[in-house]
Regions:
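A short glycine-rich, Lys/Arg-flanked "PGG" loop and its adjoining helix->strand segment in the class I
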Residues: 189-201
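Conserved catalytic/acceptor-binding region of the Class I
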Residues: 88, 206-270, 285
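Class I SAM-dependent methyltransferase SAM/SAH-binding core
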Residues: 109-111, 117-165
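A short acidic, Gly/Pro-enriched loop at the edge of an enzyme's catalytic core
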Residues: 164-175
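Conserved alpha-helix/loop element of class I SAM-dependent methyltransferases that forms part
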Residues: 89-106, 123
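Core SAM-dependent methyltransferase catalytic element
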Residues: 251-254, 320-327
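C-terminal helical/coil "lid" or tail adjacent to the Rossmann-like core of SAM-dependent
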Residues: 70-80, 257-315
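A short SAM/SAH-binding and catalytic strip from SAM-dependent methyltransferases
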Residues: 174-187
């Protein structure tokens, strides 16, 4: 056993830490309780029944609890450029095989919803070089950041807008794409409905979202239990991936294809950086919601950094679920 493998966040406040660790099973169970049971309806879908072009639809109801949580985690995408780049390094190799299922010749106009700093928009532009790509982002500062880091690349531009209230006309894009947006969204069903509305008949709406059911490494380390604990307490929809298929089906696509992938990192250390940077970005949330004693949190980050630098550690990322739907 490696010297640090049997310890995690043990300095200073053992009693409080044991209390925090004791709460983890209940917290994870509570998060799992949001998973749909057979015959029940997701709160994300309430009020969204009917066709994708139901009259007057611009968005939909917001679950108050999810809206509050979303405000806590939104900063993850705003000020952490390094994390966003590492996230792209983790997810691009998993996303591109999904995009390869779509015939390139049929794609000339693409909408990238929740584009953040523009990493996914640039990925789409590279994969579909003959298409024009529009990145849609709510935060004006991120729109400016994305544009500045894209330069004068032909066929790529960014605009400010609300993902749950897409302003574009019906059937105006060949491909509508989103990645890791619904997990943050206060109303993911409104986003999905809007995606199918603005995709043309025969076009494609593609979502790629996490199902953060487990985070683990080998050899196993107790730090990852705390990572899973925080992930399931801080994000609005940490397991939205498992709800994607029923959510898309609610809006009656003509065709739907879905699958799941699990990433593994044994030599680059990129997943280790991804977990550590995410937990660092959650610092204000941990403090504001008192999810963990601050010295325990600092010890967790330090342990994640040490684990990240261990060349013997193999990371297995939680599953990601993808859906390709056609209106």
């Amino acid at each position: 056993m490696r010297p640090h493998a049997a310890r995690c966040c043990v300095r200073g406040t053992g009693r409080r830490l044991r209390k925090s660790l004791g709460e983890i099973p209940q917290a994870v169970a509570a998060a799992r309780g949001r998973t749909l049971s057979p015959g029940t309806e997701s709160p994300c879908l309430q009020g969204h029944q009917g066709g994708i072009r139901a009259s007057g639809l611009v968005g939909g109801p917001v679950c108050d609890r999810y809206e509050t949580l979303n405000l806590m985690t939104y900063a993850l995408a705003e000020d952490n450029a390094e994390r966003q780049q590492v996230l792209a390094e983790c997810l691009d190799p998993l996303t591109l095989p999904v995009l390869q299922r779509i015939p390139k010749a049929s794609i000339t106009r693409i909408l990238d919803i929740g584009c953040g700093q523009g990493n996914t928009t640039r990925m789409l532009a590279e994969h579909f070089p003959d298409a024009s790509v529009t990145g849609l982002e709510y935060d004006p500062a991120l729109v400016a950041h994305a544009a500045a880091h894209t330069g004068n690349r032909s066929g790529v531009h960014f605009e400010q807008g609300d993902a749950s209230r897409i302003s574009h006309s019906d059937a105006s894009f060949d491909l509508v794409f989103t990645r890791y947006l619904l997990t943050h969204s206060p109303d993911p069903a409104a986003v999905v409905r809007g995606m199918l509305r603005v995709a043309r008949p025969g076009g494609y709406a593609v979502a790629f979202e996490p199902d953060a059911s487990i985070d683990y490494c080998y050899p196993p380390h107790p730090c990852m239990d705390l990572v899973n604990y925080l992930w399931n307490r801080a994000f609005p929809h940490p397991r939205i991936g498992r709800e994607l298929v029923p959510m898309f089906r609610t809006f009656g696509p003509s065709r739907l294809e879905a699958g799941a992938v699990i990433g593994m990192d044994h030599d680059r250390g990129v997943y280790g950086r991804f977990y550590r940077l995410t937990i660092e970005a959650l610092g204000p949330v941990v403090e504001d919601r008192n999810l963990m004693a601050q010295d325990d949190y600092a010890a967790l980050v330090a342990d994640l950094r040490r684990l990240e630098d261990d060349p013997q550690t193999i990371y297995f990322k939680f599953p990601d679920v993808w859906v390709i739907a056609q209106p």
